[in-house]
A protein has these predicted regions:
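Hydrophobic residues in well-ordered beta-strands that form the structural core
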Residues: 122, 143, 201-203, 277, ...
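PLP-dependent enzyme catalytic core of the Aspartate aminotransferase-like
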Residues: 346-347, 361-397
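Conserved core of the PLP fold type I
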Residues: 57, 62-198, 208-223, 297, ...
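Conserved glycine-rich beta-strand-loop-beta hairpin in the small C-terminal domain of fold type I
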Residues: 278, 295-305, 317-330
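Conserved core segment of the aminotransferase class I/II
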Residues: 222-295
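N-terminal small-domain helix-loop-helix segment of the aminotransferase-like
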Residues: 10-101, 282-283, 350, 393-397
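Conserved PLP-binding catalytic core of the aspartate aminotransferase-like
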Residues: 315-348
Length: 397
């Protein structure tokens, strides 16, 4: 029997991230700036090992039976407490879902709210899964032009005038793939447009706790006076990606609808990982742990920026992240980026082409994402020396 799949579930465009991973596997000396994994040395391995031991041996039967669909109660309590106390979010009329990482939410939100033909507004280059999850529901993942401060409000308003918009998807802190952080004034402009056109905002903030420079900027959710923001967070980037624990906080009515769909499609997520995260949060000074994570990431980011400034062509630009995991390298428009990519790969340096992150309507782009979290400082310096020399070869001094 042959199966005919609808176009909406077919991924569009090449998977450049997978290509870099597969071509680099087993290659001696390959330095990858392509894979967006957390830094291994930032994961509190011994603390997590101890938490697993305590959770499994304290009450094993509680892990071996069905549990609450909405998630572990203690983890939800600790998460909500941090959202309210640290991030100044108002819990009145709100609900919380514990999810299988923040990634699961990228699928659940469109399934819950989109009709075929609805438009979702997002940065022209943004997280690949956010783009495809909208497309998979028959929606249009419409890319909005950006500048050094993120999404341009006037461009967003032009798109919103179609009347087909449902929500705005944003990673306002240390955006993936660009590393850009949206200033407070810009956030308020975006919020005003959402209010004017009755759009809700999906604020995806998996990197928000990893600020290693500059001042804290309030979340959209913290000034959400009209109850139109869904705030997604994750413990993947701060504790462990493999535990797959995230959360969504927002208007109770919407949260209840998303929870119902989650129950029917994914059921209960594993209790053991939730209880391990709750145990870790109860047993350590989480803020002190975050300071260590930030220190690790700052050291690596500084190594990347310093090596770029030392070795790269003056005609190539690199964003200056103040947190998170990524930087965005933009080439002159006359450079053949496909040839540049292949040359980098042949020199054992992996980078990701901007096409991997292109939303609907995005320009061709002449940029690459660089992730600085996995390589060592020595590997970063060596890789950027190679990359920098190639930028001069392709672009001139």
């Amino acid at each position: 029997m042959s199966f005919s799949l609808p176009e909406r579930v077919t991924l569009k465009g090449p998977n450049f991230i997978r290509e870099v991973f597969e071509r680099g596997v087993g290659v001696e000396g390959f330095i990858s700036f392509g894979i967006g994994n957390p830094a291994p040395e930032a994961i509190p391995v011994e603390v997590i090992e101890k938490a697993f031991d305590e959770v499994v041996h304290s009450n094993p039967m509680s892990l071996l039976q069905y549990g609450p669909m909405q998630g572990d109660a203690r983890l939800a309590e600790l998460t909500l407490e941090r959202l309210v106390k640290t991030h100044k979010m108002n819990p009145e009329g709100q609900g919380l879902i514990i999810s299988n990482g923040a990634g699961q939410l990228l699928g659940l939100v469109p399934i819950t709210v989109l009709e075929p033909g609805d438009e979702v507004y997002m940065d022209e280059f943004t997280f690949t899964s956010a783009i495809n999850s909208v497309r998979n529901m028959g929606g249009k993942a419409l890319g909005i032009k950006t500048d050094e401060y993120g999404m341009i409000p006037s461009e967003l308003e032009k798109a919103a005038q179609s009347g087909k918009g449902k929500y705005i998807y944003l990673i306002p802190n240390f955006q993936n793939p660009t590393g850009i952080t949206m200033p407070l004034e810009r956030r308020k402009e975006i919020y005003a447009i959402a209010s004017k056109y009755d759009l809700f905002i999906y604020e995806d903030d998996p990197y928000g706790e990893i600020r290693f420079a500059g001042e804290y900027i309030p979340t959209f959710k913290s000034f959400d006076t009209e109850n139109r923001v869904l705030y997604a967070g994750s413990y993947s980037k701060t504790l462990s990606a493999g535990l797959r624990v995230g959360f969504l906080f927002g208007p109770a009515k919407v949260i209840e609808a998303i929870q119902a769909l989650k129950n029917n499609t994914a059921g209960q997520m594993p209790l053991v990982t939730q209880k391990v995260v709750a145990n870790v949060l109860d047993s350590i000074d989480y803020d002190a742990h975050l300071e260590n994570v930030r220190k690790v990431y700052k050291t690596k980011c500084d190594a990347l920026l310093n090596a770029f400034n030392k070795y790269a062509s003056s005609k190539v630009k690199l964003t200056q992240p103040t947190g998170g995991m990524f930087a965005w390298m933009t080439m002159p428009e006359d450079v053949d980026c496909d040839e540049f990519f292949e040359t980098c790969m042949n020199r054992n340096v992996g980078i990701i082409k901007c096409g991997a992150f292109a939303a609907d309507g995005a320009g061709e782009g002449h940029a690459f994402r660089l992730s600085y979290t996995v390589p060592t400082v020595e590997e970063i310096t060596k890789g950027m020396e190679i990359l920098g020399a190639l930028t001069k070869e392709f672009c001139g001094e």
